[in-house]
Amino acid sequence: MLIALSVMLAVFAALMIFQQVHSRRQKAVGEIVAERLHVSDLEKYVDSEYSGRYVDAILCEELKSSMLDVYNRVCDVERRSRILMSYNPSIAKFKDDFENLHSIVNAHNNRFKDDKLREHKAFFDTVLAYPLDDQQRRSIVSEEQNCLVVSSAGSGKTSSIVGKVEYLIQKKHISPERILLISYTHKAAAELTERMPHPGLRGYTFHKLALDIISAQSKCKPSICDNTDAVFVRIYRELAHNADYRKCLVEYFADYSDLMELDEDEKSKNVRRLQLGESTDRRYCALFPDMDGNEVHVRSGEEKKICFLLTSLGVDFRYEEPYEHQVADERHVQYRPDFSIHYMDGGKPCRLYLEHFGVDEHGMVPTWFAKDRGLTYEEANERYNDGITWKREVHKKFGTRLIELSSADFAYEKARQRLKRELVAAGVPIREVRSDELFDRILPENSMREKVFIRLTATFATLLKTSCRSMADVAADVAQRGDKRSRFIVGKVLEPVVVRYNEILRSEGKVDFTDLIVGATALCNANGGGNYDCIIVDEFQDISMDRYNFLLALRRGNPQAQLYCVGDDWQSIYRFSGSDMNLFCHFDQYFGKTDLNKIETTYRFGNPLVEKSAAFIQRNPAQIRKNIHPFSSDAKTEIVFREYSRGDAVGVLERIVAEIPLGKSVLLLGRYTYDDYLLAKNFRQRRSGNSLFYTICGREVEFLTMHRSKGLEADYVVLLNCNNGSFGFPSTIADDPVLGFVMSDSDGYLFGEERRLFYVAMTRAKVRTIVMYDKSKPSVFVLECISPERLADKPIEPHPNAGNRWTRADDRKLYKLYCGGMGFREISQKMGRSQTAIIMRLEKLGLIDARKPVRKF
């Protein structure tokens, strides 16, 4: 009894002590909060302390820093005793509010915007000839340090810019001289200046602004090289006289130039992914004609190289010439060997056949063989190898001579050496062509191939500067990748051009346009940025790394200038000129905390085009999501697809133009400048400056490339030649992979930039967009728009035993079968596993070496 009483007294004493300690700590924490804030409700505090003010990122960080000590002390108390926190809800609320301070600030800023919209309603209703919409107004009243306005086609981004400038001048009382307007073209900059005739306010291009800064700060106006294309032609002509460089170019075109097109594996992956397939008979044009002077179109890059090797060895050949004996039957069409080699032996004409088999050192076909044919991998492998066996048996039956090359020869042995050895052994006379003669035949002066190559060198040198990289940076990346092709092209082909280009500019005392931006950036960083309160940038989706650095330098100051950037990532189509969509889509990562505003009402076109175009572009997950809608539910814009048969394109176009009411504007758009070839052949042409017009059905209509059409509109827009193929739309002509070292990263989506270009083209119309296509080869984009349900991926069925573990008994059986001379196909059938699994297991057991050729089966 006494013990129980003692325990109760001890517990009571402990509770009293705890209550006293709790009371003191609670009071201490309460005093801490009260001392610093006077209130523990941060939401009320922010609204009170910053009443009528926008809390930008800088103010928010200052506010957070001023409370950090209190927050840390509250956390310290919480770590010591969570019970104490539960007794004081205001302290717990303070901690929760502090951890969600950005949300509290965002809510405060939204209320600030609402207040400003009510206060300045009359201004926004009348500042332009028509009232600005709510999204435009909210972006204009934002006072965040970084404001990105994500616009849409026809959404009035220029109106937003004009409204922003007028708001800054009329309502914020900012001097026009302290507002910097930047656009990408002289025409756009001049238009902005004309629409806002305030003394001291002027629209600039990046280059004009950079020129003025350099001229003012250096007291010397730079001399600009405004015809760099001519400089690169001059450099090419100089280097082409160097024997070593000529030899490098021959090697480039012989071994590496075919990668400027999508390789077959990539092509098949792309087609499968879209489920809208391009035909698998896609061809590569060989560098040289055959023995009859005919252009040769082969089926793969390796066959293209074989054509080059045969020509360089002085061997006459024809491609896919019918076999000299009739062998067609119910299962086989007439046999056409890959190459028929013709030569004289003792005055007698002879023929040798050369087959190129697309198998690796294990006799296995590429995975895309199965994908393109809708087969399992085992079925594709078996079918292809059956074809090899049949061809060999045909030659054996008729006593004709066959030599073979395979993909393995290109991977593990110099194909030239192997081919030469086989030809000599067969008795074919070899007359090797000198390197100089090969060069002259590959790159005739003023040929299209020469022009394309010069354009590649110019693009690389230009992008090297716009990406703010050096040759040392690129060389380091190439070395890290360990890519033989890239090392050769960058080091042997492109670097001499870059070095010579910079030498010429220095020797002539000139700079190019990118040099202007880089130079002005350096001056701004050294001497302080411009004296601006706000920098406004139009067409921000076209921003490049050099311009990004220039903007950072321009806004340097205390305080730094506010940045208001307007653009549409859905219309980012200039990656080949250096634009980097990452700078737009991840704006806050480059500039800091950002107020992102979307303007999603289009005033140009209506449904169904609004819905269809938005669905089309947003299939790319890299694009910013938007809820695009027309300004009126009554606005209607159609998109129609008009097919034509080969030879009837002109007639269909005439009927389309004839159906368009008189007085309505019309634009003809092509993916390429030469998409007007049918127009030029069939209609009267007129040039006016850079504009090209054709008279069709008695009315004059303008032809533009889709790139040039950006920013324009017409009542009716006709998209020409929306067909499949290398020079179709989307184009499957890929940039040379080495440009990847100086270009911004792509968005990773199949034909991402081509998709954006198609979106730009289809959204130029106010009344109707008409898409013309050849019904025998429609563009994958056309098929997607007509039948979007066909986009569903069709997965390749795995082997039924895929994933089954290999047991010791399995390994013993495999060892026995393989060492007994059985081939991969037979082992696969015996063991119920795929041929790929058999080969991989043999490699793991050390029975075959993947790096060396093995016996064929």
What are these regions (language model features)?
Residues 16-225, 763:
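P-loop NTPase Walker
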Residues 387-388, 392-393, 546-637:
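Conserved RecA-like helicase ATPase core segment
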